[in-house]
Amino acid sequence: NTGAKAPRKQLANKAARKSTNVNAVSGVKKPHRFRPGTVALREIRRFQKSTELLIRKLPFQRLVREIAQEYKSDLRFQSQAVLALQEAAEAYLVGLFEDTNLCAIHAKRVTIMP
């Protein structure tokens, strides 16, 4: 006996570990998935950097006309007036969600609910 240790059989283990990402039967690779919360944080950073409106313009315009219809029929809106309403509505909603998030954090929660 020369005192040398027998080589370990790790090659099979490594191959088995590597093949866990590939379906053994069909050979189809599983799609990459981010950990929960990673994409949400990335979206938060992206939207905080941007200044564009987040609600689509035409659906918002239809909503404004629908609400205005209840008060007076045949009202007309300048395009700038609808944009001003949308800016104000989005600013209000962003502030509301910020306050809601602070309340959730204060209550040691991560999910906000209606």
UniProtKB/Swiss-Prot annotation:
Keywords: Chromosome, DNA-binding, Nucleosome core, Nucleus
GO cellular component: nucleosome; nucleus
GO MF annotations, alphabetized: DNA binding; protein heterodimerization activity; structural constituent of chromatin
Disulfide bonds: none
Tree of life domain: Eukaryota
Region Disordered: start-end pairs: 1-29
Signal peptide: none
Pfam families: Histone (PF00125)
UniProt subcellular location: Nucleus; Chromosome
Subunit: The nucleosome is a histone octamer containing two molecules each of H2A, H2B, H3 and H4 assembled in one H3-H4 heterotetramer and two H2A-H2B heterodimers. The octamer wraps approximately 147 bp of DNA.
Protein role: Core component of nucleosome. Nucleosomes wrap and compact DNA into chromatin, limiting DNA accessibility to the cellular machineries which require DNA as a template. Histones thereby play a central role in transcription regulation, DNA repair, DNA replication and chromosomal stability. DNA accessibility is regulated via a complex set of post-translational modifications of histones, also called histone code, and nucleosome remodeling.
Similarity comment: Belongs to the histone H3 family.
Protein name in the entry: Histone H3-5
Record organism: Stylonychia lemnae
